[in-house]
Every structure is written in structure tokens, then in C-alpha cells.
């Protein structure tokens, strides 16, 4: 699994959208947010606090609904490459600079037979303050 972030450009006292791309290998999927069953680990993006930058909201992609031999009903999942959108707001006191918004992507990967132990991947969103 690979996680990358599209650089975001933001101006003081304005909003911008950052995109975190999640690429899941063929033959695997990760649970959607929200997951179908409460015992499954949802894909969840958490971001650290950076002075002058606030996260307004996070938008998870629409899930695919697929049937698997190990599940009693179809599951909401992400496969292939999918995007998580992050709405950011910059404080008016920010000065032009390059910053990084660090975070973590919490996922539970599965194949067509079984779900694996949940894991965490590092995320780093490049920010250009204009």
C-alpha cells in the first residue's frame, strides 16, 4: 500500500483543499469509512496540529460495495487508488513559507479470504503558504 499527498497551496485567512491518495495493491482492499461492521477498522486519517493551519473537515471517498467469502454481507471497501480530501484553513498571521502537515492513515487491509491486523501509515501533506 502506498500513501502520497498532493501539495496544497493556501493563502493566509483562506481555505484550500489537500488530497491524500491511497493506492491499494491489486487483490487487496481496505475498509471504508464508515466500515460495514463495527468490528472492522475504518480507514481513518488523523492529522497533527500545525500552528496557523486548521483542519476544517475530512471527506472520505464513496465506497465500493463488494461480496467476500469471509463476510456474511457485502462490505464497503476502497480498492485501487482512492482520494481522501482535507479542507484546510490558514490563519491570517501566516507568512509565506513551505510547511508540512504530518499525520497518520489508519487502515485494515484485506484480501479475498481474510482481513489482516490493522496498521498505520505515515502521511505528510506539503503546504505552500503564499
Residue ranges and their predicted role:
Residues 1-130:
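Extracellular/lumen-exposed scaffold segments
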Amino acid at each position: 500500500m502506498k500513501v502520497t499527498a498532493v501539495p496544497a497551496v493556501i493563502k493566509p485567512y483562506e481555505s484550500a483543499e489537500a488530497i491524500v491518495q491511497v493506492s491499494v495493491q491489486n487483490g487487496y482492499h481496505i475498509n471504508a469509512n464508515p466500515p460495514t461492521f463495527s468490528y472492522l477498522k475504518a480507514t481513518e486519517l488523523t492529522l497533527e496540529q500545525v500552528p496557523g493551519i486548521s483542519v476544517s473537515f475530512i471527506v472520505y471517498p464513496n465506497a465500493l460495495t463488494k461480496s467476500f467469502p469471509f463476510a456474511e454481507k457485502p462490505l464497503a471497501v476502497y480498492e485501487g487508488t482512492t482520494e481522501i480530501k482535507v479542507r484546510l484553513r490558514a490563519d491570517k498571521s501566516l507568512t509565506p513559507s513551505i510547511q508540512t502537515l504530518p499525520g497518520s492513515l489508519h487502515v485494515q487491509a484485506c484480501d479475498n479470504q481474510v482481513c489482516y491486523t490493522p496498521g498505520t501509515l505515515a502521511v505528510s501533506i506539503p503546504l505552500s503558504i503564499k
